[in-house]
């Protein structure tokens, strides 16, 4: 049985041009919770998708400053995780959990 906390760690898959390029190197990119640590991300991916994770790299993308109707606002900061999978394993991120 999957722990419900794993669903709080993984927010969504990140489908971008760069994330499709790193899929050739057996890597998958996820948007994750800002408070999530690398061991929590590794445990969540292994539990939810049933794969073996060899490495987790994280980055924090700062939100851009935008103007809306004359007022300055700021987009949210987003934490991303680049998850490297073991040889021969893959995740189909186009299907839901």
Swiss-Prot record:
Highest taxon, organism lineage: Bacteria
UniProtKB keywords: Ribonucleoprotein, Ribosomal protein, RNA-binding, rRNA-binding
Coiled coil: none
Pfam families named in the record: Ribosomal_L23
InterPro entries: Nucleotide-bd_a/b_plait_sf (IPR012677), Ribosomal_uL23-like (IPR013025), Ribosomal_uL23/eL15/eS24_sf (IPR012678)
Any one biological process term the GO annotation gives: translation
Molecular function (Gene Ontology), one example: rRNA binding
Keyword Ribosomal protein among record annotations: yes
GO cellular component, one term: ribonucleoprotein complex
Subunit structure: Part of the 50S ribosomal subunit. Contacts protein L29, and trigger factor when it is bound to the ribosome.
Record function comment: One of the early assembly proteins it binds 23S rRNA. One of the proteins that surrounds the polypeptide exit tunnel on the outside of the ribosome. Forms the main docking site for trigger factor binding to the ribosome.
Similarity remark: Belongs to the universal ribosomal protein uL23 family.
HAMAP family cross-referenced by the UniProt entry: Ribosomal_uL23_B (MF_01369_B)
PANTHER family: 60S RIBOSOMAL PROTEIN L23A
Protein name per Swiss-Prot or TrEMBL: Large ribosomal subunit protein uL23
Lineage: Bacteria, Pseudomonadati, Pseudomonadota, Alphaproteobacteria, Hyphomicrobiales
């Amino acid at each position: 049985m999957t722990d419900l906390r794993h669903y709080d760690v993984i927010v969504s898959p990140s489908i971008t041009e760069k994330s499709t390029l790193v899929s050739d190197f057996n890597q998958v990119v996820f948007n994750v919770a800002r408070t999530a640590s690398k061991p929590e991300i590794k445990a969540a991916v292994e539990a939810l998708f049933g794969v073996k994770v060899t490495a987790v790299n994280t980055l924090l993308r700062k939100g851009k400053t935008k103007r809306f109707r004359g007022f300055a606002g700021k987009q949210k900061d987003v934490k991303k995780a680049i998850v490297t999978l073991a040889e021969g394993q893959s995740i189909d991120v186009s299907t839901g959990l």
